[in-house]
Amino acid sequence: MASPIEVRLQMAYPDFTVRTDLSLPGSGITALFGPSGSGKTTCLRCIAGLEKADQSFIRVHDEVWQDTEKGIFLAPYKRAIGYVFQEASLFAHLSVRDNLEFGMKRIPRQQRRIQLPQASELLGIDHLLQRNPDKLSGGERQRVGIARALLTSPRLMLLDEPLAALDTRRKSEILPYLERLHRELDIPMLYVSHAQDEVARLADHLVLLDAGNVLASGPIHETLARLDLPLAMGSDAGVVIEGTVSAYDQHYQLLTVTLPDSKLSMRVAHAQMQVGTLLRIKVQARDVSLNLQPDYQSSILNRLPVTVIEEALADNSAHVLVKLDAGGTPLLARITRYSSDQLNLHRGQSLWAQIKAVAVLA
């Protein structure tokens, strides 16, 4: 069975060549992640039809957008995409409402799946509709830009580093709106970023690019745990886990989060949440230590029985990265080579992971 989204590109530049062969899910958020110059934006622009690759095949759901072998190239305006750039280019002489309505005009009424009231409510911009763009903050402008893209009733959303031009405060304001779009709209999104914290919070599927090549493509919880990828060697190495809130301790303000497909759970300091709520958390490799026996004489809340899957030298040869299995959930631990030798770590070994900190992402 073919994947809902297929992207095969080859295009040569003086300094590198872009080569992608991707089969992507037709729902959720797929992040294209990598350093500057890795080919993320080029890939997005080719999907949008804004750049032509030397060789290409792009299919979204059941529609072929381009195929160089068959001479197919669908014009950008026919591709049913919503494109969000780093900075929203709004018409300065029009109000927010008029900017949004302008973007809707080319969509026949019978094809409009999203209406202005729904888009403005989803992005929290009802109170901004009468303002002009020069009266908006950077975060407000970008929310208007996202709403404008939604009003084209797209089959695919393309977001090219939409938070890159914003400061930390403005980013934190927009992220919940992107999460809401993810939850409430059945529109796949391709999200370009080089910010690992954004990707960890938003993405379901991760494509890792470097120098125009695809290093990896897969579910984010699996891809972040791969020791053969550069992400595992960085200081922010860690895993993303989507668990379920199973209990709340009102006195200590601790959530109990059950890990997916497992009877194992972790306790997380957080405000009360409804039992059954899905919660995305991140565990950094540097916050995981290993022990042959569970140590209950410490302040560490979370101790999980784990099995060693593999280990690899970290970027600093004094350390190793250890991949662990916690009841089907992957974990990473960054420990010294000395500690590895002292524990006599080996594949299949059973021991205990002690987790010093857990970050709630969403």
Curated annotation (Swiss-Prot):
Oxidoreductase recorded as keyword: no
PROSITE patterns: ABC_TRANSPORTER_1 (PS00211), ABC_TRANSPORTER_2 (PS50893), MODC (PS51241), MOP (PS51866)
Keyword entries, A-Z: ATP-binding, Cell inner membrane, Cell membrane, Membrane, Molybdenum, Nucleotide-binding, Translocase, Transport
InterPro entries in UniProt: AAA+_ATPase, ABC_transporter-like_ATP-bd, ABC_transporter-like_CS, Mo/tungstate-bd_C_term_dom, ModC_ABC_ATP-bd, Molybdenum_import_ModC, Mop_domain, P-loop_NTPase
Record domain Mop: where: 297-362
Annotated binding of ATP, by residue: G34, P35, S36, G37, S38, G39, K40, T41
A Pfam family this chain is assigned to: TOBE
Membrane topology category: Peripheral membrane protein
SUPFAM superfamilies: MOP-like, P-loop containing nucleoside triphosphate hydrolases
Enzyme Commission code(s) on record: 7.3.2.5
GO molecular function: ABC-type molybdate transporter activity; ATP binding; ATP hydrolysis activity
Coiled-coil zones: none
Superkingdom of origin: Bacteria
GO cellular component, one term: plasma membrane
Cytoplasm listed as a keyword: no
Main subcellular location of this protein, as a coarse class: membrane
Localization annotation: Cell inner membrane
Record's function text: Part of the ABC transporter complex ModABC involved in molybdenum import. Responsible for energy coupling to the transport system.
Family label: Belongs to the ABC transporter superfamily. Molybdate importer (TC 3.A.1.8) family.
Subunit and interaction comment: The complex is composed of two ATP-binding proteins (ModC), two transmembrane proteins (ModB) and a solute-binding protein (ModA).
Protein name according to UniProt: Molybdenum import ATP-binding protein ModC
